[in-house]
Structures are given as C-alpha cells and as structure tokens.
Curated annotation (Swiss-Prot):
This is Phosphoenolpyruvate carboxylase. The lineage of its organism: Bacteria, Pseudomonadati, Pseudomonadota, Betaproteobacteria, Burkholderiales. The gene is ppc. Residues 9-24, 34-57 have a biased composition (Low complexity). It comes from the Bacteria. Its EC number is 4.1.1.31. Residues 1-67 are annotated as: Disordered. GO terms for cellular component: cytosol. InterPro entries: PEP_COase, PEP_COase_bac/pln-type, PEP_COase_Lys_AS, PEPCASE_His_AS, Pyrv/PenolPyrv_kinase-like_dom. It comes from Paraburkholderia xenovorans (strain LB400).
Length: 994
C-alpha cells in the first residue's frame, strides 16, 4: 500500500526534512552516511584492510568528530563483513538497496522512492526480512557504542587540555557557587548533612535490551576504546580479531527473549549495572567531590547523601507477578551482590596491605582487630593489617550466611588455607564501616595514608552508601487495591460492612479510629482472600527485610492513583496490621511511628491540581505531625510525568507539575516540614525525559533544596549507565545540578514571574484543549492509534514482566484511557511522530499571538515569550526538549504508518491534523527561539541524528511492511519475529524511548 500523500501531507513532510539539520555534502560526512555495508569496491574489502588511521586532533568541529566518523564506518564495515560471511552477498545487496532507497525517501521525499521501497519490501521472504531488520538494528546499536566512545574521548581531551570546567561537573558547580558567594564551608556542610539524592532504577514494559546483547556490547565498547591507544601491529590485529568475534557473536545471538521477562530477570538486569558501574563509580564520585572541594580550599565531611533506589521487586502496581517472594528474592540478590563485592575487596586488601609492624606502627584499635582474627599463620605475626582483614573477611562471610543462608556467596579460605571459621556476624553495616575506618585511621597515623586511597577508602565509602542492602527497594501499589484490602479486613472484623462505599469523611473516621486502637484487625484463624494475603504478605516481608538488612533496605511506600487523604491513611493501617507501624496515632504517650514513609503519587492533571489540598488535609490529621516528626520531619511526594502527559498533553503536564511543586513547597514551608520531591521521569520527553542537568535546574525555586529522587527507566538505564565512564558523569550531573539548584540564587526577578505564569496558564489551557480534542474527542482516534502504531504488537513483545495495558481487553473494548502511559509514548516513538512531546504547543501559541487585537500587541506578546525563553529556566528547558523531539519526528516516515489505517477518510483526517499541528509548532518554536533549524543550540545531537537516522529509517519501512503482513493474517513466525526485532532496533536508534 502506498503512503498517504495529500498535498498538505507532502508539503509538511518536505518541511519536516527542511527543519532538520541540513545534510552536509563533504566527504567526511559521506564517510558516516555511507552504508555500514556500502556496496562499492572499497566496502567489499575486509575491515582489516581499512583499519582507521590515528585519531585526528584538529580544532574544527568536523576534525573533532573525525574519530567518530571513523569508528562508525569501521564498525559498519565489520558488520558488513559479518553479514556477508553469515548470510551471503544476496542479503548484503538487499540491505544496501533498501538503505539507499530509504535515504532518497528521507532527503527528497521522493514518491518514486516510496514505490520502489514498497515493491522491494514486498518481495522479501520472511527469512530475508528478519536478516535485514537485524542488520539495521545492530548498526543502530554499534553506532550508539561509537557515539558513547566519542563522548568519553572528547571528555578526556577536554580534561587533558586543562580547559575550563564543563556544565554538569562538580568543578563547574563549585565555580558558580564561589562566584555567587554561596560556597562557604558551613553552607556546603549543611547542604551535604541534609541532602538526599537518589536515582531509582525501575523496570518497565519498554525495556527491550537482553542482557546477553548488553554484555556483548560492553565488550565491543571496551575493544573500541583500546583502538585509541598506540597499538603495535600485532596488538591491533588482535584487537580487530576480538572485535570481529564479538560482532559475529552478536549476529549469532538471539536479539529477542523467547519468553516474557520475569521479575527475577529484571532484578538480575538491574544488578548488572551495579557490577558494571555503580559499585566502583559511586565511591569514585564521592572522592571527586572531596577533591573538588579541596581545590577550592573548602572542607566538608560527606555523609552518604547519594544513594541508589529500586522499584524492581517492590512495584506491584499493575503487576500481579510481584509478591512477597519477589521482594525477598530482590533483597536477597541485592545483598548477595554487595557481600560478594565487599568480600572481594577485603580479600584484595589482604594482598595489598602487607605492612609490617617491624617497619611501621599500628594503632591500638588496629592491633585489637588483628588480635581477634582467626588467622594463625606464623608468617603474618608482624602484619596486623592482613590479620585484621582476615578477621573482617570471616565476619563478612558470617554476616552473609546468617542473612542469606549457607553457600549464598562464594567464600575463600580464612588464613593458612583453613576452612572458613564460624565468626561473629556484623550486627549491621555500620559496624563493618567502623572496622574499615580503624584501618584507615591507623594508616593515616603511621605515614600510610596513601595506602588507603586506591581501595580501602573507596570500600569504606561503598559500605556507607550501599550498606548490606545495596539499594533501597520502594513498595508501590494502587490505591484501589488498598481500599479493597481494608474493606475486607473491616468487614471480617465486624467494624464496617462496606468501607469502600463510605463518603471520604466517614472513611477517615473509621481509619483514624482503628489507628488509635492498640488491637489488630486481623482475626487469627479466619480465611482471607488471596488479595488480602498477598498484600499483607508483602508488608510482612518488608518488616523482615528491615530487620535483616537495616531500615534503609525498605523505607518507602508509594501509593499510585492518590486521589484522597484516605488513600494515604489506608496504608498506615496496613502497616499497623503487619507490625511496621508501632504506637497509636494521636496518642501523645505512645505516638505512632511508621516504618515506611507513606508517599502519594499524583499522576493525572486533576490529581496534580488537588495535591496541595490532600497534603494539607493529611498533615492536619491528629497524630500525623508526630508521625512526620519521627520520619526526621521530612515528607516525600511523588509526581508522575507519564499519566499527566497522556491526560493533558506535553505543555499542560509540565505546567501543572510546576504549579503543583510550587504549591507543595509553600505548604511544607508553612508547616516547617522538609519536602522531598520524587520525580517519576521516563526516557521520552513526553514522560519527563530529556537532559537531567537542565531538568533539575529548571525546577521551580525552592523545590530541590538538596532533596531529590528521580526514576531511571527503560532504555535510559542502558544508555546512561551501561558504560562506566558515561555512568560516572551522569551520576555527577545529578549531584552538580542539585547543588546549583539548591544553593545558587534564582535569576528571575519576582516582578517578572506573574506575567510569565499568567501567559503559561493561558497557553496550557489552550494546549490541553487542542490535545484532548485530538486524542479523546476525535471520533475514530482510538482506531487510528491502534492501526497506525505497533501498540498491539508491543503488548505481545516479551519485554517486561508487567502487562502493557492496565486491563486485558479484546480489540472491541480497547480504550486509550485504559492503556498504560509508557507503551502509549513508546508507540508514538516507533511510528516517528513522538506526539507526546509536542502536540498542542503550536495551536496554543498561535492562538495566543493571533488573538492579539493589534500588531503591536502581537509583537508585545511574542517579545514576552522570547523573554520567557531567555530568562526562565523552566520555559527554556521545555522548549529545548520540544526542539529535540521535533528534530526526531519524521512526517515522511510517519505517513507510511498512517497508510496502515484501513479507513481512508479517518486516516486522512487525523494525519492531516497532526501534520498541521507539527507545522504550527515548528513555526512558533522558531519564532520564539529565533532559530529556524532544529537543534541549532545542540549541534552534537543534531549531528548524531544526521549520522544515525538514515539507518533507522529502513527499520521503520520494514516494520510497516511486516505489520501489513501480520495484520493481513500471515502466521509465519518470522513475520512476528521481524516486527519485534524492528521494535527493538527503532528503540535503540531513538535511544530515549523508555
């Protein structure tokens, strides 16, 4: 089927290309945009015949990027060689033909190219199709690796040159603080004492990378980095052989999972990032901060203010596969990983700290540690550090054994080759930290301080940060589930027959009455439903987990769909029933103390607007102020970016989040309570994604204040933390931005804000009306969405453990409202419209400007928008993110997905509305920013899109062809497999998709 081409659509698609970064015609650019398997004589040579020349070190942008071009070309040739070896020249030639035709279609909006492409794709056998999809998918993955390598390369060159510090680094943040007079030691010490910064890893239905693929890609990245070094001919040949082997391994490795990912798989996937990045890089980050402070003559003791969190194993919202057993497995596996790390590091320290007390002294505390060690070797009687470390090792082994069971972690012999002794376990991780500091202090007192720096100090820091639990696991469940559990408990206890039907005030009366009672609700011998047993079982497991691994192991309970105060109080009562809440609410003699902080999640537009009222009413309840006091006088509130976007569109979601944050800060300041905001950000801009540094700095004044948690999801986890160097910088960026957002004075004069906010409110109202008119009020839009995107196929893909829809429905009962926000956004990315990151903005701004009663007033309104862009971080960040999304949008490719809609009239009507809005949005964005080209302010990303997207487009064209076959009833397993492979490849090419 040909793509839909009304005049307007064709014009818009052409405009879309014009708005993108211009295609350069230089030979260097052609190197990159040549096929990974270019069908010419030179490309037919083996990759080894064209090893890259030494990396250029020129000053022009093109020279700086030359090594990147070489790497992409080199990896592409390697892939081409492997493709020929594995599949033959015929498939290789098909890949090249499709690539060239797709490039023509992209650059020229060539209708003849579209017809040629259609014909070629229809002629492919299912086997050929799968091979072609895999080729382009792997090229996307390899191009990502090359880009990451180049980022590391440029960062290193920058540091070696001694250039000025870059935004997003601790050094840059401290320089800004010093300039602003906000960097005195007492100020910074207070900041670190009160700060809590926590990235939280979550598993989601759109996380599509298999661990086997990630592992192979890590190897490719490492080998590619080696090529920047001066290698001998033999070393280079060996490097190339290893690279060829890994690319061959990738080609022969299944890209997709055979079965749906289990929660246990998701846990292991997350743990791989700890081994690859977090265990080493987080302690290194602390050391970097200390070093940067010292360079400015500042001294501040760093408590463990930066920690890691996780939802994996504790997030039950919409996922029936998460149970008490899952939570137990999650914390057990996390603990096993951290115990293995500690024991490995202590073992290595035993080899390194060979200090003899015949040559250097030791503190009395260190001698005591050595004296109680089980080590009896006559060869180490004068080596107190080694003996102390052997004792610490056996205590760690015992600590793991009592918490995890026999044989849970590998244990080495404890001195003289003897079997591990039954040592006394550490009571908690703090005791282990104290022992490590005994070693550090003793070395410092006896001229051995340099010996602590390489391993001992980082280990002590790791133990402070990770404890015996590695990461705090949040519990999350939907408010309606809690209500059902409470209803059953109250009914069985004879307290209230139908709690769920009560008005809100009556619900609160019942809940508060029960929380004031010392007795439990549960009857000891009564039978309860599976739901009640499962929910209470999770909370009981959380109590046991806290007892075993410390209070930090599980400390938060998030209630999704929080709409009322009772939604929060219900969880307090459930904690009481499971021993997590002690005392009685409102009783001054025995005040309630909750083990888990009850955290509301406000997601929809109405809920965000209601958030301050709910929190005000909660704090006003008798005894809640004492409960919050017990929590350190802190209260966390989570804000959801996904559902608010799906509910009201990009602009309104951002604005309502901004308003809710300001209102919450005002309320909490008034009550003298510290507010910590938890940002439920995703990978896509429509779900709060975008550069973290700018996102944090654009938060409303006073809303960060050293306290922030934020989710890391989907593909973002792999792209941010798969590479240790990039992972370290991403972690540093979060700290740097939090420092600046908390301590720097905000630049906008209060007099400007009212005008800005009034304009934003007008734009938001208009944008939401435009968005909802399309998504929720257009007859047939539901059918358009389900037919023009691979949403149904995404639901089938074995990506995550959670279903893609909140309900399982047959096609006749599908509703946009029931669809999870994450696959909703993911689907718009797949068809290259990325509608969730821009739709409605153009109409809103155009109406705002065009409704001006005079040209002078229009000019004034536009000038105000320009001022907002230049001086208001919130608005500037919003436009920057939208700019990125518009650059990634491709109307020409999207038109081919529109052609999948069976109702031609519906197809034309909806797609032309989307195209018209894209044109309006691009036009007004250019008017406000003064930049006619997309990503004019972000040339790095502009080049990335230009270099990679010609290889992404064929995947879209192939996906459309496969969707046609699948929906026409083709039952060939390779067709379904090809669709799923294309979903994977497009996600990799877009990068921020989760």
């Amino acid at each position: 089927m040909k793509a839909v081409r009304s005049d307007k659509t064709t014009q818009a698609a052409t405009t879309a290309q014009a708005q993108k970064p211009a295609k350069a015609g230089s030979s260097k650019i052609k190197i990159v945009t040549a096929a990974p398997q270019a069908a010419n004589a030179s490309a037919r040579q083996p990759a080894s015949a064209q090893a890259p020349a030494p990396k250029a070190n020129g000053r022009t942008r093109e020279d700086k990027d030359h090594p990147l071009f070489q790497d992409i070309r080199y990896l592409g040739r390697l892939l081409g060689d492997v493709l020929r070896e594995q599949e033959g020249d015929a498939v290789f030639d098909v890949v090249e033909t499709i690539r060239q035709t797709a490039v023509r279609f992209r650059r020229e909006d060539d209708s003849a190219a579209a017809q040629t492409l259609d014909k070629k794709l229809r002629s492919l056998s299912p086997e050929q199709t799968v091979s072609v999809v895999r080729a382009f998918s792997y090229f996307s993955h390899l191009a990502n690796i090359a880009e990451d390598r180049h980022r590391n390369r440029r960062h290193r060159i920058h540091e070696l040159a001694g250039s000025t510090s870059q935004p997003g680094t601790i050094a840059h943040s401290l320089e800004r603080l010093v300039e602003a007079g906000a960097a005195a030691t007492p100020v910074l010490q207070e900041f670190f004492n009160n700060a809590l910064i926590v990235p939280v890893l979550t598993a989601h239905p759109t996380e599509v990378q298999r661990k086997s693929i990630l592992d192979a890609q890590h190897d490719v990245a490492r080998l590619l980095a080696e090529r920047d070094q001066q290698l001998t001919d033999r070393e280079r040949a060996h490097n190339e052989a290893m690279l060829r082997a890994r690319v061959t391994s990738l080609w022969q490795t299944r890209m997709l999972r055979d079965s749906r990912l289990s929660v246990a798989d998701e846990i292991e996937n997350a743990l791989s990032y700890y081994r690859a990045t977090f265990l080493e890089e987080i302690p290194a980050l602390y050391a970097d901060i200390e070093e940067a402070l010292a360079e400015h003559g500042l001294e501040a003791r760093l408590p463990p203010f930066f920690q890691m969190g996780s939802w994996i194993g504790g997030d039950r919202d919409g996922n029936p596969n998460v149970t008490a057993e899952t939570l137990e497995n999650a914390i057990t596996r996390q603990a096993a990983v951290i115990f293995e790390h500690y024991m490995e590091q202590v073992h290595k320290l035993g080899a390194e700290l060979s200090v003899s007390n015949l040559l250097a002294g030791a503190s009395d505390a260190l001698k005591e540690l050595a004296a109680v060690s089980p080590d009896q070797s006559p060869h180490r009687t004068d080596e107190p550090y080694r003996r102390a470390l052997i004792g610490m090792y056996t205590r760690l082994a015992a600590s793991a054994r009592v918490r995890l069971g026999e044989g849970s972690v590998p244990v080495r012999s404890a001195g003289r080759g003897a079997a591990p002794v039954r040592a006394k376990p550490y009571a908690d991780s703090a005791e282990f930290v104290r022992d490590l500091h005994v070693l550090i202090d003793s070395l410092a007192e006896h001229h051995g301080a340099p010996l602590a720096a390489p391993r001992l100090s980082p280990l002590a820091r790791a133990a402070e940060v990770f404890g015996f639990h590695l990461a705090s696991i949040d519990l999350r469940q939907s408010s309606d589930v809690h209500e059902a559990v409470i209803t059953e408990l109250l009914r069985r206890a004879g307290v209230e027959e139908n709690y769920a039907e009560l008005p809100e005030a009556d619900k609160l009366n019942v809940l508060l009455s029960e929380l004031a009672q010392p007795r439990p609700l549960r009857l000891p011998f009564a039978e309860y439903s599976d739901l009640v047993k499962s929910e209470l079982g999770v909370l009981e497991e959380a109590r046991v987990t806290r007892e075993k691994f410390g209070a930090r192991a599980v400390r938060n309970y998030i209630i999704s769909h929080t709409e009322t105060v009772s939604d929060l109080v219900e969880v307090m009562l459930l904690q009481k029933e499971t021993g997590l809440l002690r005392g009685c609410l409102g009783n001054a003699n025995d005040p309630a103390q909750a083990g888990l902080m009850v955290i509301p999640l406000f997601e929809t537009i109405p809920d965000l607007r209601n958030a301050p009222h709910i929190m005000r009413d909660l704090i006003a309840l008798p005894g809640v102020d004492a409960l919050i006091e017990h929590q350190g006088n802190e209260q966390e509130v989570m804000l959801g970016y996904s559902d608010s976007n799906k509910d009201g569109g990009f602009l309104t979601s951002n604005w309502e989040l901004y308003r809710a944050e300001l209102a919450l800060v005002s309320l909490f300041n008034e009550r003298g309570v510290t507010l910590r905001l938890f940002h439920g950000r995703g990978g896509t801009v429509g779900r709060g994604g975008g550069p973290t540094y700018q996102a944090i700095l654009s938060q409303p004044p006073g809303t960060v204040d050293g306290q922030i948690r934020l989710t890391e999801q989907g593909e973002v986890i792999a792209s941010k933390f798969g590479n240790p160097e990039i992972g370290r910088r991403n972690l540093e960026t979060v700290v740097a931005a939090t420092l600046e957002a908390s301590l720097l004075p905000h630049g906008i004069a209060p007099a400007q804000l009212p005008a800005f906010e009034e304009t934003m409110q007008q734009l938001s109202d208009a944008a939401m009306a435009s968005y909802r008119a399309l998504v929720y009020e257009t007859p047939g839009f539901k059918e358009y969405f389900f037919e023009s995107t691979p949403i149904s196929e995404i639901a089938e893909l074995n990506i995550g453990s959670r279903p893609a829809s909140r309900k399982l429905q047959d096609p006749k009962q599908r509703k946009i409202e029931d669809l999870r926000a994450i696959p909703w956004g993911f689907s718009w990315g797949q068809c290259r419209l990325l509608l969730t990151g821009w739709y409605g903005f153009g109409s809103a701004v155009a109406a705002h400007l065009d409704s001006a009663p005079s040209d002078a007033e229009r000019t004034r309104r536009l000038a105000l928008l320009k001022k907002m862009h230049k001086t208001w971080p919130f608005f500037a960040n919003l436009l920057s993110n939208m700019d990125m999304v518009l650059a990634k949008t491709d109307l020409a490719v999207a038109s081919r997905y529109a052609a999948l809609v069976s109702d031609k009239k519906l197809r034309k009507h909806v797609f032309e509305r989307i195209v018209a809005e894209w044109e309006r949005t691009s036009k007004v964005l250019s008017e406000i920013t003064g930049k006619s080209e997309r990503l004019a302010e972000n040339p790095l990303l502009a080049r990335s899109i230009k270099n990679r997207f010609p290889y992404l487009d064929p995947l879209n064209h192939l996906q459309v062809e496969l969707l046609k076959r699948h929906r026409a009833g083709d039952t060939n397993a390779r067709v379904r497999r090809g669709i799923h492979l294309s979903i994977n490849g497009i996600a990799a090419g877009l990068r921020n998709t989760g």
